[in-house]
Amino acid sequence: MRFGSLAVLTINHMSRIGKRAITIPAGTEVSIVSNEIVVKGKGGTLKRVLHPAIKVVVLKDEASVTPLERSRLSRALWGTYAAHLRNMIQGVNTPFAKKLQVEGIGFKVELAGKQLKFALGFSHPVILNIPAGITAAVDKNVITISGADKEQVGEFAATIRGSKKPEPYKGKGIRYEGEVVRKKQGKKAAAAAA
């Protein structure tokens, strides 16, 4: 008896994110097609497969996410899917963006059609294809990546940074805007300081 009431108590107090209704702004359409959440807006269309342990109810100007089971998995997915749905709605209205900086003497980047071309101190240029759904802009040594899908923007930004991670001695490489790279002393500098 106590265990049953404890389970109910846990499910009722679970997921502050999942419990909140999600506002659907004007000009945005949210629907469930087969087993997919489909969100359409001025910035495009996003789709995500809906897990069978989760239910999404769409009303006129709001949506809600609820778990269909009293399992640990469904409780975990409850907040996750609510966050995904919020991000999808935001993304089709206002694109997500990430900025990166290319640092280092002789290091540069240029936009060539649907590719980013980097000179990063290697014997060959590094070329990255810009994925569909992503927009890239280059201003001197700053790259701006934007798109409706928050995860896709983050993944592509991480791929760019991974082509030449900032090194800890001089800080050369590609870093996120505002990222602080903790610098190490070289052996000569450390010996001189001693």
Q: Locations of the language-model features?
A:
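N-terminal amphipathic/basic-hydrophobic helices that include classical n-h-c signal peptides
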Residues: 1-13
